[in-house]
Amino acid sequence: VAYFHQRGIRYITLTHGKDNLIGDASYDTTATYGGLSEFGEKVVAEMNRVGIMVDLSHVSDNTFRDALAISKVPVIASHSSVRKFTPGFERNMSDELIQALAKNGGVMLINFGGTFIDSAYAAGSAQVREHVVNWLAENNLSRRDPSAQKYIQDYTALHNPFPTVARVADHFDHVVQLVGIDHVGLGSDFDGVGDSLPTGLKDVSMFPNLFAELLKRGYSKEDLEKIGYKNIFRVWRAVAEYAEKQP
């Protein structure tokens, strides 16, 4: 951990898609440790000591709780959304976890992926995938075939349109109403969610569309500054200052 800090790393996501030596992941139903492993507990403590932010996106609920119980400083969830809008999707955060993270002083950064922000879109995506697999087999085509790509694009647009910027704003609203403006920020996951990003929020150049929607909902300039950078910088600063005081 100290080596990575020396190399410039300032946050580490504890797990990804599968349970690892550190702890259990949200996408993995194995529950190898029932949360953090003993090694994972040491990793979190060492991250605190050297000044690396603990990122709890991708971890299971129990791993999330275990890490919060150990961490002496605020944590982050670098690209997670609100589970209320996607019931049963453990990769997103429940209200209980959002409240626990806020009590810790942390910040969750909202993921913009369609399946993360809208359960209807997620269900539609599964149906589209099944149809496309069958259609490709029936027509003896590969996804790389230009005609197949055109068909998939047109079929998806017709049967499962992308979510909107307004739906992303709903996630910000929920967090703010639940725990306040100091605990939410921009996670995006632009490079991780494939072709599922909302209409009007396909890349960073479109952030003004989201900010305009939030302004319409009554957010202030100071609120947007907190969402844009102040909240995550506050956590980063707290982690660094704690580490500076360690032997």
Residue locations for each model-derived region?
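Glycine-rich phosphate-binding "P-loop"
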Residues: 21-34, 197
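Active-site environment of divalent metal-dependent phosphoester hydrolases
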Residues: 18-23, 59-65, 82-85, 115-118, ...
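Mid-to-C-terminal alpha-helical segments outside catalytic/metal-binding sites
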Residues: 202-247
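Conserved, mostly hydrophobic/aromatic
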Residues: 8, 54-56, 79, 108, ...
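Histidine/acidic residue-rich metal-binding segments in metalloenzymes
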Residues: 1-6, 28-76, 89-106, 167-182
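Short acidic/histidine-rich active-site segments
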Residues: 110-115, 179-201
